[in-house]
Every structure is written in C-alpha cells, then in structure tokens.
C-alpha cells in the first residue's frame, strides 16, 4: 500500500469513495498539477455558456461538446435536470414528490428497500447520512410507478444521484427520467430494451474486439456476466 502521508490528496475521493490500495498518488499528483488548469478553464467556459443559455433549451453542437468534455461538479445537478428533461417534468407536477412521501406505503416494498439500504455503497464515508434520503426516493418512486415498483439496481442509481446532487427531490426526478425516458424498459419485467442492448453489445465485441470475444468465450464467462446483469435488477431482495 502506498504511503499517503506525503500526498496532498486524501485516500478518499471527492465523492466519499475510498481509493484503491494500489492507487498511484505520485502519478495522480503529477497529472492533476496540469489538469487543474484545464478544469479551471472548463468551469469558466461553462459559466459563460450558462449566462447565455440559462435554461439550456438550445442543445446545439457547442453544448454537446461541453457535456462530452465534462460538466463541472457544482453545475451537474442543475445541468442534469435541464438536459435530461427532469426539470420540465418537475415543473408540471411540483407537488408530486411530497404527496408520494405523505402517502401510504406497502410493507413488502418498504421491507425490500430497507434490506438494500446498508448494501448501498457501504464503503462510502458520506453515505450513512444519506440513507434516509435514499429510502424516501425509492419508496416514493416504487409507489409512483407500480409497473416497476422497487427492484435491486435502482438503489445504486438513486444513491449516485444523491451523492452528486445532494438533493433528494432532484434525485427523485432524475431517477424517474432515467428509468422511464432515458433507458426505458431496462427495469420492467420483460427487460426488452436491456436485452436488446446487451445483444448489440455482444455483437460489437464480436466485430470490433474479436480477441476479447475469444478470450471471453474461452473463459465461458460471457453468459454468466450477462445473465447476472440481466436478472439482478428484477430480483426481489432476499
């Protein structure tokens, strides 16, 4: 394990995740010493862009290029809300989230979520204080979208949204937008779009990385990997 006492970087990253034991602090410091200048310039460009296009209603080539290069952390919550369409959904039903929290809950759904709370990012140093928010988001969404309800996998999506946005209601609307609009039918019972995308992904590996595909086939692990990812989202917590 590398000694971190001489590094100006913590052994925990900015999101609260512990860095790997073999994390190369020396190389990271060298990289960041120059990359911080890039991040500063990028933030200044985003500031100028947001002054011109506050609502991000104009999704042009420039905005797409900026997004691909990276959205500065402080701007991510609002930018995600606007470019995903979550902000517009929230505006149409501003009281929805609170009304869902004030409604009655099904015990089976609540119990499933409670089982998964301690399993969600247990090594994240910040997450203990966010578990109540995670529960609220998941229980509200499960009762809002009865077709999907609650299934394993949603806790990690919602958990990451909370970590990045630090906003419970924004995380709910982003979760709703992701599950229903951005990757629809990934978490439904038939998982139609997920199965389709996995098939496309497999075909891409075969065509573009045949050596990798042969290695996977030799290990006989592809089916296990795919089946594990496919069936995990809709398994009830045990």
Residue spans for each PLM region:
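Alpha-helical cores of eukaryotic small-GTPase signaling modules
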Residues: 98-137, 171-227
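Classical protein tyrosine phosphatase
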Residues: 153-156, 160, 168-174
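N-terminal transition regions in large eukaryotic proteins
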Residues: 1-142, 162-165
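Alpha-helix N-cap/N′ positions at the starts of helices
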Residues: 58, 62, 153, 223-227
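Long, repeat-rich segments with strong aromatic
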Residues: 226-238
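Hydrophobic/aromatic-lined pockets within catalytic cores
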Residues: 84, 88, 139-146, 162-167, ...
């Amino acid at each position: 394990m590398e000694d971190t006492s001489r590094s100006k970087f913590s052994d925990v990253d900015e999101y609260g995740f512990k860095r790997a034991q073999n994390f190369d602090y020396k190389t990271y410091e060298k990289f960041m010493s120059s990359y911080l200048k890039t991040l500063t310039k990028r933030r200044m460009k985003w500031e100028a862009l947001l002054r011109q296009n506050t609502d991000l209603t104009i999704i042009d080539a420039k905005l797409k290029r900026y997004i691909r290069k990276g959205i500065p952390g402080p701007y991510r919550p609002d930018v995600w809300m606007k470019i995903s369409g979550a902000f517009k959904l929230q505006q149409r039903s501003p009281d929805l989230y609170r009304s869902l929290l004030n409604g009655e809950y099904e015990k089976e759904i609540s119990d499933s979520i409670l089982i998964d709370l301690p399993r969600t990012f247990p090594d994240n140093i910040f997450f203990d204080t966010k578990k109540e928010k995670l529960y609220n988001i998941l229980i509200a969404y499960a009762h809002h979208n009865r077709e999907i309800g609650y299934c394993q996998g949603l806790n990690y999506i919602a958990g990451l949204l909370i970590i990045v946005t630090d906003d419970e209601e924004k995380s709910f609307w982003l979760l709703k937008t992701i599950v229903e609009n951005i990757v629809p039918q990934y978490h439904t019972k038939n998982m139609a779009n997920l199965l389709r995308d996995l098939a496309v992904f497999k075909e891409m590996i075969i065509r573009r990385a045949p050596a990798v595909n042969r290695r996977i086939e030799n290990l006989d692990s592809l089916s296990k990997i795919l089946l594990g990812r496919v069936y995990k989202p809709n398994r009830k917590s045990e």
